């Protein structure tokens, strides 16, 4: 049905285009005048054509869709019909009626039906229209081939692309078909057939518009005259192609686009463009075949029905880039390592590692460090990576994992030599340790000490009758516990000095514990045997209580009665020390690299960092490179206890050295390395590791001055900030420990900075900014910092004795506490009457019933049991005289300060306020 409707529309368009209705009317008039010799074929043809034209509706043709196969979809029908009508009129004027009459008979035999004309012009297939038998169609086609003459020529234009052609190319070659009806001749121009309209896409263009043609060889432009001369040959060639197309049914499949040549450009009057080479980026699509569906079964689909609306739009596929990262299956890392660095090594995102650890209950951030070897390895297994810990750098910076004793055990016996014993004198304060050492050395060291107490660890090399002895003098004060522990660690023998008149005290017992912890032999020297109240049996009993059974009581602990003042018992003490050293067989290897311990360190004004060290094994030479924990150094100078310069120091020799990068902590071990460069590298790596550890601690517990002040204010405690300065590292450590032992529920101590050396400008500025007090121990203020102290008003406290410094700090902490107000009752008065005064207000007429009321007393007004008001007395009068005090039983007038709500019967109580200082 739809096919027939389209054919009817096309017939109407053809009839309107060639003005077929006017021609038919003229032909009908001519046919009536013709003779009876007309053939039946012509009559049937005219009747068929007439009936078909008459049956066509004369309505306006409906709008043709853009995708229709009609040739008139490309060009307006009105324009083409006007051109054809004008040509028909001109041809009618030029040709005469006589020429038509001569060829009437010839044209009668060649008359065709309108359907055949449409098939010739448009090449359409009339599958559904009524048609003749196939044999008749073949005979008619052969007849058309034989009867075609030169006046009728059809030229198929060469189309370069499926885009609409220009209007002037719609009719390229116009020929005249001569018809003679009743001695009348007329040339009817036949419109050139156009290819059927291709189906267009949603953009209004065919797919071939987007396909670039293949590059062709360079075109050769021909002159226009040559093209005109060859026009006949082209027409003949096109006619042969048209003949073939009449027989062969037109294929509806995909057609390759025709390449436009230079001849075609010349024929259209176009200039030949420059040749541009291009590539076919997007290949042509294959023709899509439609499946047989339900509409085909029901006969509802036509062959040319548009299927584009059924096609789903191909969504643009997102260019998903595949992850081509090659992740390692094994990895060697060095601990500690941050999460970010580990993720970079594993070629992963840091968030992946953080997520895995979070699932295991470990909350970390990108910059957190992993220190646990097991955690790092398990994390690697989660991502298929085997992680091993690189310990090569640790071993390098550790230098050696063997202790001094293990090195000596592995050394050849022929290289080992006897060394002097290292003896530490320990005991309670004021029991005579330093005096006993002076008696052995025949010196007067104790006289030069502040407060007659030792506050530094001293190291000496003594030459005695029994041989050389290295002596360490340790402080006996309770604050110097760490010093005593260090002395016990590096010594071979501990001499416990006990005053015979006092016995064992707290620090004496502590010294015994340090010696036992260090597994050191203890020799007890009972001092002060020259005093009348000397009682060695009491000391024996106390030693037995500490599991040190003395020899006089059948034990193994050696005891010697001696006196530092008279020198009694000192030779026996030296003999016992030599005997113990012989029993221990103390040996060392002088040919090895030097190793030892830092006993003390201080900041010298001219020499910089100075350290007192004890060489325990090997030989230290001037110029050697050392490593002290995080510091390094190169020995520039080396002196003994007398200030004598040395070139080398053997085992069991205490010396002072300079040339250090910083101030080493007391108790640190040192070791000699190959050169200064290696020492610097090792110290830098250690410092970096320590810095990372410090950063981790700060991340876990962020502490700042503001936070501490807020915490102190939240708990209601006062805070005393202190900047500490001491002459040596050991004294600084002892002072810091002693200060932190001060306990109080009302005030706290905060050491914001501590260092070795003199009080500097930076210390004063820091104290001023943090409202702190500068405490110096055995040190002074720098000359250029004194003016700054006065300018900023900073308190600087300098002390030489440690317990004086501690007592001073306690007083300062107590001064921070607010004083407690205490009220003392003075007297009472009862209000008998009230008087109004225009100037003063209400005056209370009172009688003192208890004590006395003074003019400067504080008063409170009570009404019943409730205190109504507290304040001061503005005026106190007796009759009309101002008085300072009113005694019991006397009437007076009292004017309260800024209070007038006084009633008869109120009681006025007088009291004084005293402020009492709090204790820690």
Swiss-Prot record:
Q: Does the keyword GTP-binding apply?
A: yes
Primary location: cytoplasm
Q: Where is this region: G3?
A: 473-476
Q: Where is the composition biased (Basic and acidic residues)?
A: 49-63, 80-112, 206-222, 233-258, 264-308
**Binding annotation for GTP:** 427-434, 473-477, 527-530
Q: Which GO terms describe its cellular component?
A: cytosol
Q: Which CDD domains match?
A: IF2_eIF5B, IF2_mtIF2_II, mtIF2_IVc
- Give positions of region: G4: 527-530
What Pfam families has UniProt attached to this entry?
Answer: EF-G_D2, GTP_EFTU, GTP_EFTU_D2, IF-2, IF2_N
Q: Where is the tr-type G domain?
A: 418-585
Q: Does the keyword Protein biosynthesis apply?
A: yes
The GO molecular function terms of this record are: GTP binding; GTPase activity; translation initiation factor activity
Localization per record = Cytoplasm
Region annotation (G1) ranges: 427-434
| Keywords for this protein | Cytoplasm, GTP-binding, Initiation factor, Nucleotide-binding, Protein biosynthesis
Q: Where is this region: Disordered?
A: 27-112, 143-325
The residue ranges flagged as biased composition, category Low complexity, are: 37-48
Q: Where is this region: G2?
A: 452-456
Annotated region (G5) at 563-565
PANTHER family for the chain: TR-TYPE G DOMAIN-CONTAINING PROTEIN, TRANSLATION INITIATION FACTOR IF-2-RELATED
Q: Which family is annotated?
A: Belongs to the TRAFAC class translation factor GTPase superfamily. Classic translation factor GTPase family. IF-2 subfamily.
Q: Which NCBIfam families match?
A: IF-2, small_GTP
Describe its function: One of the essential components for the initiation of protein synthesis. Protects formylmethionyl-tRNA from spontaneous hydrolysis and promotes its binding to the 30S ribosomal subunits. Also involved in the hydrolysis of GTP during the formation of the 70S ribosomal complex.
Q: What is this protein called?
A: Translation initiation factor IF-2
Question: Which species does the entry assign this protein to?
Answer: Protochlamydia amoebophila (strain UWE25)
Q: Which gene encodes it?
A: infB
């Amino acid at each position: 049905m739809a096919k027939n409707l389209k054919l009817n529309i096309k017939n109407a368009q053809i009839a309107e285009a060639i003005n077929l209705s006017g021609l038919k009317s003229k032909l009908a008039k001519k046919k009536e005048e013709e003779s009876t010799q007309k053939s039946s074929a012509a009559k049937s043809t005219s009747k068929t054509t007439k009936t078909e034209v008459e049956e066509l509706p004369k309505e306006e043709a409906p709008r043709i869709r853009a995708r229709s196969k009609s040739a008139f979809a490309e060009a307006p029908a009105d324009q083409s019909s006007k051109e054809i009508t004008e040509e028909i009129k001109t041809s009618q004027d030029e040709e005469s009626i006589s020429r038509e009459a001569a060829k009437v008979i010839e044209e009668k035999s060649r008359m065709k039906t309108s359907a055949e004309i449409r098939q010739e012009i448009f090449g359409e297939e009339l599958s559904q229209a009524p048609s003749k038998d196939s044999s008749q169609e073949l005979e008619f086609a052969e007849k058309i081939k034989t009867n075609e003459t030169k006046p009728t020529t059809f030229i198929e234009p060469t189309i370069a692309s499926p885009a609409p052609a220009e209007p002037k190319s719609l009719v390229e070659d116009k020929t005249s078909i001569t018809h003679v009806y009743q001695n009348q001749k007329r040339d009817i121009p036949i419109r050139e057939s156009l290819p059927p309209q291709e189906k267009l896409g949603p953009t209004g263009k065919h797919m071939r518009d987007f396909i670039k043609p293949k590059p062709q060889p360079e075109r050769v432009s021909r002159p226009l005259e040559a093209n005109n001369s060859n026009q006949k040959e082209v027409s003949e060639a096109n006619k042969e192609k048209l003949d073939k197309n009449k027989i062969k049914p037109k294929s509806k499949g995909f057609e390759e686009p025709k390449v436009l040549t230079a001849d075609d450009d010349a024929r259209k009057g176009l200039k030949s463009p420059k040749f541009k080479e291009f590539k076919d980026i997007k290949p042509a699509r294959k023709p899509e075949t439609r499946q047989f569906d339900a509409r085909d079964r029901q006969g509802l689909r036509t062959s040319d029905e548009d299927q584009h609306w059924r096609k789903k739009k191909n969504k643009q596929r997102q260019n998903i880039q595949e992850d081509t990262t090659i992740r390692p299956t094994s990895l060697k890392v060095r601990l500690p390592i941050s999460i970010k660095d580990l993720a970079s090594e594993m070629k992963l995102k840091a968030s992946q590692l953080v997520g895995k650890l979070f699932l295991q209950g470990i909350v970390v951030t990108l910059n957190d460090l992993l220190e646990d070897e097991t955690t790092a390895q398990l994390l690697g297994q989660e991502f298929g990576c085997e992680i091993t810990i690189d310990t090569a750098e640790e071993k390098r910076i550790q230098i050696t994992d063997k202790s001094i004793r293990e090195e000596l055990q592995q050394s050849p016996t022929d290289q080992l030599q006897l060394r002097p014993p290292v003896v530490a004198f320990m005991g309670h304060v004021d029991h005579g340790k330093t005096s006993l050492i002076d008696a052995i050395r025949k010196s007067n060291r104790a006289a030069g000490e502040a407060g007659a107490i030792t506050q530094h660890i001293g190291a000496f090399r003594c030459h005695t009758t029994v041989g050389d002895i290295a002596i360490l003098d340790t402080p006996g004060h309770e604050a110097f516990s760490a010093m005593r522990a260090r002395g016990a660690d590096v010594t071979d023998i501990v001499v416990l000095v006990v005053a015979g008149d006092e016995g064992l005290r707290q620090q004496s017992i502590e010294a015994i514990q340090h010696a036992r912890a260090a597994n050191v032999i203890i020799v007890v020297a009972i001092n002060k045997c020259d005093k009348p109240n000397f009682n060695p049996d009491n000391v024996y009993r106390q030693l037995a209580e500490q599991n040190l059974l003395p020899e006089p009581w059948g034990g193994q602990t050696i005891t010697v009665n001696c006196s530092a003042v008279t020198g009694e018992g000192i030779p026996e003490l030296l003999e016992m020390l030599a005997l113990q050293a012989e029993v221990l067989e103390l040996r060392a290897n002088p040919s090895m690299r030097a190793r030892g311990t830092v006993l003390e360190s201080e900041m010298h004004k001219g020499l910089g960092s100075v350290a007192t060290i004890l060489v325990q094994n090997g030989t230290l030479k001037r110029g050697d490179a050392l490593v002290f924990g995080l510091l390094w150094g190169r020995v520039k100078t080396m002196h003994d206890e007398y200030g004598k310069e040395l070139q080398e120091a053997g085992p069991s020799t205490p010396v002072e050295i300079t040339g250090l990068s910083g101030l080493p902590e007391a108790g640190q071990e040192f070791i000699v390395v190959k050169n200064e460069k290696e020492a610097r590298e090792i110290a830098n790596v250690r410092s970096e590791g320590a810095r990372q550890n410090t950063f981790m601690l700060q991340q876990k517990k962020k502490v700042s001055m503001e936070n501490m002040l807020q915490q102190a204010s939240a708990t209601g405690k006062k805070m005393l900030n202190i900047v500490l300065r001491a002459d040596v590292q050991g004294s600084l450590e002892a002072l810091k420990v002693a200060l932190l032992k001060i306990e109080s529920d009302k005030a706290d101590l905060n050491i914001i900075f501590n260092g070795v050396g003199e009080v500097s400008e930076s210390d004063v500025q820091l104290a001023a900014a943090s409202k702190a007090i500068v405490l110096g121990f055995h040190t002074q203020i720098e000359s250029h910092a004194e003016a700054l102290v006065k300018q900023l008003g900073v308190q600087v406290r300098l002390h030489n004795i440690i317990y004086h410094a501690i007592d001073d700090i306690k007083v300062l902490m107590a001064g921070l506490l607010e004083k407690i107000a205490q009220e003392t009752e003075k007297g009472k008065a009862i209000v008998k009457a009230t008087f109004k005064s225009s100037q003063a207000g209400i005056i209370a007429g009172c009688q003192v019933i208890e004590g006395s009321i003074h003019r400067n007393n504080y008063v409170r007004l009570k009404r019943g049991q409730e205190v109504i008001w507290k304040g001061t007395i503005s005026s106190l009068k007796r009759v009309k005289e101002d008085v300072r005090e009113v005694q019991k039983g006397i009437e007076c007038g009292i004017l309260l300060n800024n209070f007038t709500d006084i009633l008869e019967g109120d009681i006025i109580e007088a009291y004084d306020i005293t402020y009492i200082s709090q204790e820690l």
